[in-house]
């Protein structure tokens, strides 16, 4: 029927819920799971996971104890204790998303994080705000917070909090971090993403579970822009004062 789901050749399913118009095919192992409408699963492993509407999971992707929301596209790689908001994209084998919250996120090859500092155990977490992109082999040691639509390049060990600087490019070789505010706002990739997200909505329901707001200029983001501008203005004033006193 129009709203039926299809299950073909899966390996193991136990204690789960499968919504309407779901297709599950291939080497799938899943226990204690919820899979919502319009989702495609192929060759993946899920343990204690929620998968929202319109998601695509395949290529040997594995996840446990994670929430995966609408229109996420996950192939290869893995997620552990992760909150993967709408349009989270991870397409590479060596990618690990762990102990953090992500949304409208793009993980480059080899992107990973650590949510423990060995002696203390896995007690830390972090936040990549909407639209963050990670370059290949980027690494973040939690706790940390990255502002919306920023780009990470390198390895970050000093727990940055750049929430007040959206649209920034952050670079680090493991030591001090360099931040270039308001750079990605002019990148063609940012505007391309903004335009393509509504076109890649796989949900067919007229009343989908997730209410997605695609607007780029949202009040929360503009408030961060305002806070960042004030912080830079204060720093500029102090620098000018120190130079004038010399």
Predicted segments — roles?
Residues 9-10:
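Long, structured ligand/cofactor-binding scaffold of large enzymes
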Residues 239-246:
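Single conserved hydrophobic/aromatic residue that forms the stacking wall/gate
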Residues 5-6, 23, 40, 246:
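Glycine-rich beta-solenoid repeat tracts in large extracellular/virion proteins
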Residues 1, 24-31, 36-233:
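Glycine-rich hexapeptide-repeat left-handed beta-helix
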